[in-house]
């Protein structure tokens, strides 16, 4: 197997932390997003979507979404389960993963890609050139503040989102919280459950 990634970026970080907790190392090529290497013909010949991560398995087939790569690695290496230990926990991890990705992560991405001049004409990842929509920046701020409230409530009396140990859901939330800093959004001091969660997960991941 061979992994194409860009470790500093939020989406690839989800996989980096997952592999770290699993104790897995894969041959990896870094695709520099800052230099737009993901849009070069050499990489698009590997992954036409022009995104990272991309895992090329031994058969030559590719997995290009974090959730799919994590599921594949989890099935190959079931020790230290990070996607739930029971049927219910597995479903809950997927549910939280989807919620975090479609709410907090996407809200931050909307703010970044629609408000930062570096993404002018590239408001979405990949090869499709789309104009920025400034109104999505303001909407993203509102969505993020709502997410803090929802997530802080969800963590009341809990160390982790699912079960009694860290899972992919916690990794995703931790990455999303840090990603929010890229658009100068911070967890409010009143969200004590979220702040404690961040410290708890940071001690495990960093």
Language model features with spans:
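GST-like fold's C-terminal all-alpha helical module
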Residues: 103-202
